[in-house]
């Protein structure tokens, strides 16, 4: 503090500067010409010598010369003090929802306090809905609606209640005094508007900007209550903008910087609460920064201060890759370049207004989008990443997608356009003359046509202007048509890496094609920051989901439908539940079950069924089963890159759907043997489709449950080996029966035991007939290249002929012991020869035939060594001729069968790009 007496002269010795405070060197000023300045915060105090004048000088470095002060509070300073600039500043902007009520204002104050930056400038919007309320006041007054008075009272009450909840004592009295004074002035102004029936733009801007004044004042009081020094800034005193012809404003950075220095010299503080949205013209007329003006205010202030960063606080966790209201899978983007953010903003993404980015780009100041209601979310950083940024190289080439709806496409076409200078100028001159805005332009390289998109509300004026301007060309035939295509939308794909990544456009258009979406027009600049397409408005959401899924969902994200939630299907669902998190985290395999259907009820979901509750949900919320709706849900109602139906039934009707599913691009996985062992012509048609398409059909579990029988056979064939013979025990039930048909036990006794243990089908005749084994033989034969049908196989049935006509399972089981003698004799004969009986299927590839029969094997033969329900398959090939290749293991049971199906699902994922 300096103390000056009247007629007292202060002279710096040797012209050295007087040092006040300890600001950084960049704030140290030496200006040769003295300037006259009224010092801030003078106050008189009592004391000897006729009264002292105390001058509290702000914390600056000054170069000063002093003059005599004779009873006046003036002194000659070398120059006006400049505000310090640089990374010591952080700028925050809080939108209307952030200061929507008293508690939220407290939350904002807490964020400010917890920011460890040396200096902070905070830009605030009006409280939520207040700006709309202010403009509504103006509209009502202009239309001479007396309710403007009650509406003004509502504005007053909203702020009065908020202030009373936040403030007390002198702070409350001071704020309410300012508030009531402002309301009184507004009432007079609105009365004038009411009488005139009109309000000028500057008049309206002045009225509308009061919400920011009140919220900034309240917040500054709240921050000061915590003990921190804080000043509030009316940015109309600082920000100077020039109106443009497009009803926008351009900042005058030079003049604004001067006024900021002047303001700071009078109001030094390390925390400044500034009004957003409002500014002044060079003539000091109040104005606004128009749409998203508070964001723009923060960006301008950040640039003026050369701040470390500008944080935009809002009510979302950051910038999404697409509108989350339209795309469930939209993700928060960690980083965006300035160009990417600008492009996404231009094309309608709710990020920032494009002009907000311009001021900070000048000084490479990052913008951070944060959620005031979720402080743990890191948000999105908008900055210019280094060209060699490793993380950037690993990201998808497309950062995000945005759409603009309610557009119309105008196509100007004609052979007379080619090579004629000025045609494009004339076209877009017409657009300018009617005040329309061109959103996108596309021109054929032949110059035969130009098409462009404009807002639909402006298309009639534009088309009429064009037809008037080119009427002679239309009559002469130089132009063939001026066509208007209404009800359009623009879809833009944005990404800085698109410029260096081949195939992005191919991927984009293939995704649209798969979704059956037609593209009306295409535009891409040479910078390749965006690819823009025009589509039907009705296809806008569908297209957005399609392209987003193609770029942002892993190629190993599978939309799954499970048919048959019986024993096998239920076990599979439980296995998926237990393993899903591990697969997603460690292998990037995202399995989403969108449908479960039985014969009577089905359960569908758009985002994925909760597999921890699928039984409960199916029972409580299941609807009537409908395979067409089920298929549509799994494949047609979303844009997950891949769809797969898993058929866990033994139903021929379900198997008959495979061809249609594969043709639609749905992968099929199944243990159901009916399709591969059915009529040969249908099987060949199915396999032909599979070979010609890129859709996969896996059926490992049809033969060996969880054993790798099919994959082993294919591996032999694909590596050039030749199959001579396949022989095996491939029925877990019949393996169990003959492994236990020993000693004095009767065959019927073993069958009864197996049935009671759940090893057989509900009707054991389904196992004993040999049909199941025969189907497996047919599958193996066809895999080996043999064209066999079930009718071509001799099958040894273990069902006694007289019992085939039994009308019930009970009757069959009751009469079965009567026929134990024949099998007992065969077993005894085998034992007398040192052999055992085994029920086997045989593929004789050399002689092009197959059989299902009861055979005898030496006790040292691998087939005689089985136990329980194990299966065993022996492959005799040109490579494995003397010693067959043997695959052995459990061949029955819900767990191993479901495991075999699960293995096929993971195999499909690996084919689609999952890491090995």
Swiss-Prot record:
<keyword id="KW-0520">NAD</keyword>
<keyword id="KW-0677">Repeat</keyword>
<dbReference type="GO" id="GO:0009086">
    <property type="term" value="P:methionine biosynthetic process"/>
</dbReference>
<comment type="similarity">
    <text>In the N-terminal section; belongs to the aspartokinase family.</text>
</comment>
<dbReference type="InterPro" id="IPR002912">
    <property type="entry name" value="ACT_dom"/>
</dbReference>
<keyword id="KW-0915">Sodium</keyword>
<dbReference type="GO" id="GO:0050661">
    <property type="term" value="F:NADP binding"/>
</dbReference>
<dbReference type="GO" id="GO:0009088">
    <property type="term" value="P:threonine biosynthetic process"/>
</dbReference>
<dbReference type="GO" id="GO:0009570">
    <property type="term" value="C:chloroplast stroma"/>
</dbReference>
<feature type="binding site">
    <location>
        <position position="703"/>
    </location>
    <ligand>
        <name>Na(+)</name>
    </ligand>
</feature>
<keyword id="KW-0511">Multifunctional enzyme</keyword>
<feature type="binding site">
    <location>
        <position position="772"/>
    </location>
    <ligand>
        <name>L-homoserine</name>
    </ligand>
</feature>
<keyword id="KW-0791">Threonine biosynthesis</keyword>
<feature type="binding site">
    <location>
        <position position="700"/>
    </location>
    <ligand>
        <name>Na(+)</name>
    </ligand>
</feature>
<dbReference type="InterPro" id="IPR036393">
    <property type="entry name" value="AceGlu_kinase-like_sf"/>
</dbReference>
<feature type="binding site">
    <location>
        <position position="761"/>
    </location>
    <ligand>
        <name>NADP(+)</name>
    </ligand>
</feature>
<keyword id="KW-0547">Nucleotide-binding</keyword>
<feature type="binding site">
    <location>
        <position position="758"/>
    </location>
    <ligand>
        <name>NADP(+)</name>
    </ligand>
</feature>
<comment type="function">
    <text>Bifunctional aspartate kinase and homoserine dehydrogenase that catalyzes the first and the third steps toward the synthesis of lysine, methionine and threonine from aspartate.</text>
</comment>
<keyword id="KW-0067">ATP-binding</keyword>
<feature type="binding site">
    <location>
        <position position="649"/>
    </location>
    <ligand>
        <name>NAD(+)</name>
    </ligand>
</feature>
<keyword id="KW-0479">Metal-binding</keyword>
<keyword id="KW-0457">Lysine biosynthesis</keyword>
<keyword id="KW-0486">Methionine biosynthesis</keyword>
<keyword id="KW-0560">Oxidoreductase</keyword>
<keyword id="KW-0934">Plastid</keyword>
<keyword id="KW-0418">Kinase</keyword>
<dbReference type="InterPro" id="IPR001048">
    <property type="entry name" value="Asp/Glu/Uridylate_kinase"/>
</dbReference>
<dbReference type="Pfam" id="PF00742">
    <property type="entry name" value="Homoserine_dh"/>
</dbReference>
<comment type="subunit">
    <text>Homo- or heterodimer.</text>
</comment>
<dbReference type="Pfam" id="PF00696">
    <property type="entry name" value="AA_kinase"/>
</dbReference>
<dbReference type="InterPro" id="IPR019811">
    <property type="entry name" value="HDH_CS"/>
</dbReference>
<feature type="binding site">
    <location>
        <position position="568"/>
    </location>
    <ligand>
        <name>NAD(+)</name>
    </ligand>
</feature>
<feature type="binding site">
    <location>
        <position position="893"/>
    </location>
    <ligand>
        <name>NADP(+)</name>
    </ligand>
</feature>
<dbReference type="Pfam" id="PF03447">
    <property type="entry name" value="NAD_binding_3"/>
</dbReference>
<feature type="active site" description="Proton donor">
    <location>
        <position position="776"/>
    </location>
</feature>
<comment type="pathway">
    <text>Amino-acid biosynthesis; L-lysine biosynthesis via DAP pathway; (S)-tetrahydrodipicolinate from L-aspartate: step 1/4.</text>
</comment>
<keyword id="KW-0809">Transit peptide</keyword>
<feature type="domain" description="ACT 1">
    <location>
        <begin position="412"/>
        <end position="487"/>
    </location>
</feature>
<dbReference type="InterPro" id="IPR045865">
    <property type="entry name" value="ACT-like_dom_sf"/>
</dbReference>
<feature type="binding site">
    <location>
        <position position="705"/>
    </location>
    <ligand>
        <name>Na(+)</name>
    </ligand>
</feature>
<feature type="region of interest" description="Homoserine dehydrogenase">
    <location>
        <begin position="563"/>
        <end position="916"/>
    </location>
</feature>
